[in-house]
Amino acid sequence: FQDYILPNTALAGHDIDANYFQHIPYLNSVLKDHAGDKDYDFVSAGAIHIEPIGIYSKKYKSLKDLPEGGKIIMRDAVSEEGRILSIFEKEGVIKLKPGIDKVTARISDIVENPKKLKFTPNVEASLLPQMYNNNEGDAVVINANYAIDAGLDPVHDPIAVESGENNPYANIITVHRGDEKKKDIVALVNVLHSKEIQDWIRTKYKGAVIPV
């Protein structure tokens, strides 16, 4: 699959029995968009790993170095806005509304933005590495899987990376409701949770992907 839409389309059409690419906040946004559609009655069968999202720049070495009016290029997904904004807030570049749920926060929830940074969530995720390589914008937010595919190092190349601790964005095995109890699905989740697979993930990705 070349985007984040087709895996759920295939699951809804029963072309596949499960998919493994999305986190709970993204799944919730999909379920909201397809409310009442029985083909989209999906649930998580288990969380497997986290791919910490990174912010990349060829022009600046930290978020605090970004210029006034700096353009931040982001993926076109509402479910990612709070995730990304939390990184900027943690670095002291912006502030969100007090008490807001960071998972569901939106760009409109920014209450302090001294640098007047311009967040532009309108780019398909697979195009973000190319925009970074073309030196577009002042910073580009790239999901780890696309960064890896583009030959980037998601641990050392970004100027800021989200923490893997208490991270709600773990990738999950998604199935139709009720299928999470099927023997084959339970076996799949158990294999992915096994020490052998978790050790392989740690060795292969060296921190770019974190097993849960």
What annotation goes with each model-predicted range?
Residues 41-94, 198:
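A conserved helix-loop-strand patch within extracytoplasmic ligand-binding domains
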